[in-house]
Swiss-Prot record:
<dbReference type="GO" id="GO:0007165">
    <property type="term" value="P:signal transduction"/>
</dbReference>
<keyword id="KW-0132">Cell division</keyword>
<feature type="binding site">
    <location>
        <begin position="7"/>
        <end position="15"/>
    </location>
    <ligand>
        <name>ATP</name>
    </ligand>
</feature>
<comment type="similarity">
    <text>Belongs to the protein kinase superfamily. CMGC Ser/Thr protein kinase family. CDC2/CDKX subfamily.</text>
</comment>
<dbReference type="GO" id="GO:0000307">
    <property type="term" value="C:cyclin-dependent protein kinase holoenzyme complex"/>
</dbReference>
<dbReference type="GO" id="GO:0051445">
    <property type="term" value="P:regulation of meiotic cell cycle"/>
</dbReference>
<feature type="modified residue" description="Phosphothreonine; by CAK">
    <location>
        <position position="158"/>
    </location>
</feature>
<dbReference type="GO" id="GO:0008353">
    <property type="term" value="F:RNA polymerase II CTD heptapeptide repeat kinase activity"/>
</dbReference>
<dbReference type="GO" id="GO:0000082">
    <property type="term" value="P:G1/S transition of mitotic cell cycle"/>
</dbReference>
<keyword id="KW-0418">Kinase</keyword>
<feature type="binding site">
    <location>
        <position position="30"/>
    </location>
    <ligand>
        <name>ATP</name>
    </ligand>
</feature>
<feature type="modified residue" description="Phosphotyrosine">
    <location>
        <position position="12"/>
    </location>
</feature>
<dbReference type="GO" id="GO:0005737">
    <property type="term" value="C:cytoplasm"/>
</dbReference>
<dbReference type="Pfam" id="PF00069">
    <property type="entry name" value="Pkinase"/>
</dbReference>
<dbReference type="GO" id="GO:0005634">
    <property type="term" value="C:nucleus"/>
</dbReference>
<keyword id="KW-0498">Mitosis</keyword>
<keyword id="KW-0597">Phosphoprotein</keyword>
Length: 291
């Protein structure tokens, strides 16, 4: 690429904006910093990433190419300059439109259902990696599948703490056997944040995050979540909070929206709605593609 410009720092390394000399289109170039700098790029990571090139869906940021040169890995993505976090911060009036919230949620779920059908998890969904195409007003998920290829660091390479606000309770409780429901949880948190215009449970440590979740949804026990007490980080000394009615927590949602949110924010991952079923939920029966 020509005239490369640094535009940000992602979870895994520096992100540049560049122009593809051949096609003349603008691309985003992610330089992946690997923990084991000396050994170069693990072949498992290369395999995982190569599979992601096959993933093509209108609500997923397309991975166009993978360049592996001198112990470094560069991922070439389509370029989008706006993410949902910036969008919520800069144009609050836009997100006040319930049709727009519904539209974005629908697109998120379509993208996730597609990934899950290909057995790919995201694991780190947050407003910062939901990108918006201003021309079509469509939302696309970025960084799908990278967590599996590279792991999720506790801190980014610039030592920023990776956010816990969208992390599912089973991960926070130390479960090693989590699956696709973790992404549905994250989307539920983002749904509530779009409706409330502020994060649902902004914890600043794993225990603070768990307790913020429990204060809203109630502390789980063997009745509400069979198996929870045997998760590695569950403590019988956790305070026992009752659950709140979500209508008081997210007052701006229509009843069908609350019903969907309730089924996404189910503490027990086995009872959580799937992305595929969520797309079919009655909340979306009047979906209008907002121009």
């Amino acid at each position: 690429g020509e005239n490369v410009e640094k535009i940000g720092e992602g979870t895994y390394g520096v992100v540049y904006k560049a122009r593809d000399r051949v096609t003349n289109e603008t691309i985003a170039l992610k330089k992946i910093r690997l923990e084991q700098e000396d050994e170069g790029v693990p072949s498992t990571a290369i395999r995982e990433i190569s599979l992601l090139k096959e993933m093509q869906h209108r609500n997923i940021v397309r991975l166009q190419d993978v360049v592996h040169s001198d112990k470094r890995l560069y991922l070439v993505f389509e370029y989008l300059d706006l993410d949902l976090k910036k969008h919520m911060d800069s144009s609050p009036e836009f997100i006040k439109d319930p049709r727009q919230v519904k539209m974005f949620l629908y697109q998120m779920l379509c993208g996730i259902a597609y990934c899950h059908s290909h057995r790919v998890l995201h694991r780190d969904l947050k407003p910062q990696n939901l990108l918006i195409d201003r021309r079509t007003n469509s939302l696309k998920l970025a960084d799908f599948g990278l967590a599996r290829a590279f792991g999720i660091p506790v801190r980014t390479f610039t030592h920023e703490v990776v956010t816990l606000w969208y992390r599912a309770p089973e991960i926070l409780l130390g479960s090693r056997h989590y699956s696709t429901p973790v992404d549905v949880w994250s989307v539920g948190c983002i749904f509530a944040e779009m409706a409330n215009r502020r994060p649902l449970s902004p914890g600043d440590s794993e225990i603070d995050e768990l307790f913020k979740i429990f204060r809203i949804l109630g502390t789980p026990n063997e009745d509400t979540w069979p198996g929870v007490t045997s998760l590695p980080d569950f403590k019988s000394t956790f305070p026992r909070w009752p659950s709140k009615d979500l209508a008081t927590v997210v007052p701006n949602l229509e009843p069908a929206g609350l019903d969907l949110l309730n089924s996404m924010l189910c503490l027990d991952p086995t009872k959580r709605i799937t992305a595929r079923s969520a797309v079919e939920h009655e909340y979306f029966k009047d979906i209008k593609f907002v121009p």
